[in-house]
C-alpha cells in the first residue's frame, strides 16, 4: 500500500492507475488517502482539525469544510468529540478520527489497511454496513486490506488473495468465495478453519498418509496422493 501511495519505491515493475503510469509520480501529486491499522493523528490538533486538515491545504471554503467534517463525523460517531485532542480519546476513537480524515477528502484512491481492527465490535459491525454505501457514492478506487473474510464479503467488489506478496487468486469476491482456485484461497474464507489431511488413493481404496485408517471411495480421480478438507458438522456430532 505504501508503494501505491508513493511512500515507498517498487524494487521492480510499474504502478498503473486509471490507465496512467504513476510509478514516478510524487506523493504530493497523488490524490490519495490512507488509513493504517495503527492510528496516526496530529497530537496538537483537535479531532475537528485532524479531520479537516487535508481539506484546508486545498483551499476549500470554511463552510464546505465544516459541512464535510460534520457529515463524516456523524457517520463515525465523532460529533461529540470534535473539540477534543487525540490523547483524550480511546484507541477506537483515534482510529475513527484517522478514518474520517481519509474519507472527508475527494480522493481518487483510498487505501485502507485493516481500518476496523481497533474498533469495538458494535461499531465495527455498523461500519461494515456503512462503508460500502459510502464508497458507492464516490468516484474513486478503494483498496481494502484485511485478514477478516467477513470484511471482504461485506465490502464486495473484487478480491485478491495474497501469499508472501504474490497474488494467488483475483476475481469477484463472491466468485473467489464460492469457487476458490486453490487451497490457499479456500483457507482464507474458511470459518471455522478447515482441517486438511493428506491421503493416498489406490484403485477404490483410500488411506490417510500418516496412519492406517482406510476406506472405499468412488471418487473418479487418478491414483496418487492428495490433500483433502475434512468437514465436521453439528449433524455428525449428534450422530456420534
Set out the residue ranges of the language-model regions:
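The feature captures the helix immediately C-terminal to the Walker
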Residues: 1-2
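Helix-to-loop junction immediately C-terminal to a conserved catalytic motif
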Residues: 5
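A position-specific signal in ABC ATPase nucleotide-binding domains
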Residues: 8-9, 56
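Conserved coupling/switch loops of ABC nucleotide-binding domains, chiefly the family-specific signature
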Residues: 11-14, 164
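Conserved ABC transporter NBD signature motif
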Residues: 13-21
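ABC ATPase nucleotide-binding domains
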Residues: 31-33, 37, 41, 45-182
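ATPase nucleotide-binding modules
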Residues: 181-227
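Conserved small/polar residues in nucleotide/adenosyl-binding loops
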Residues: 232-240
Amino acid at each position: 500500500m505504501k508503494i501505491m501511495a508513493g511512500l515507498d519505491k517498487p524494487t521492480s515493475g510499474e504502478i498503473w492507475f486509471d490507465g496512467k503510469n504513476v510509478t514516478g509520480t510524487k506523493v504530493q501529486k497523488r490524490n490519495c488517502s490512507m488509513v493504517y491499522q495503527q492510528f496516526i493523528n496530529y497530537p496538537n490538533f483537535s479531532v475537528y482539525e485532524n479531520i479537516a486538515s487535508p481539506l484546508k491545504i486545498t483551499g476549500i471554503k470554511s463552510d464546505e469544510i465544516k459541512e464535510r467534517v460534520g457529515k463524516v463525523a456523524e457517520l463515525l460517531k465523532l460529533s461529540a468529540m470534535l473539540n477534543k485532542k487525540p490523547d483524550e480519546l480511546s484507541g477506537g476513537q483515534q482510529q475513527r478520527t484517522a478514518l474520517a480524515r481519509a474519507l472527508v477528502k475527494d480522493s481518487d484512491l483510498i487505501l485502507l489497511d485493516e481500518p476496523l481492527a481497533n474498533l469495538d465490535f458494535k461499531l465495527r459491525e455498523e461500519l461494515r454496513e456503512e462503508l460500502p454505501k459510502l464508497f458507492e457514492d464516490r468516484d474513486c478506487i478503494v483498496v481494502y486490506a484485511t485478514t477478516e473474510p467477513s470484511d471482504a464479503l461485506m465490502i464486495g467488489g473484487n478480491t485478491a488473495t495474497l501469499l508472501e506478496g504474490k497474488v494467488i487468486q483475483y476475481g469477484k469476491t463472491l466468485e473467489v468465495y464460492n469457487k476458490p482456485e486453490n487451497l490457499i484461497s479456500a483457507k482464507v474464507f474458511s470459518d471455522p478453519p478447515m482441517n486438511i489431511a493428506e491421503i493416498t488413493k489406490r484403485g477404490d481404496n483410500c488411506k490417510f498418509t500418516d496412519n492406517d485408517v482406510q476406506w472405499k471411495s468412488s471418487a473418479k480421480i487418478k491414483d496418487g496422493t492428495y490433500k483433502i478438507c475434512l468437514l465436521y458438522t453439528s449433524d455428525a456430532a449428534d450422530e456420534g
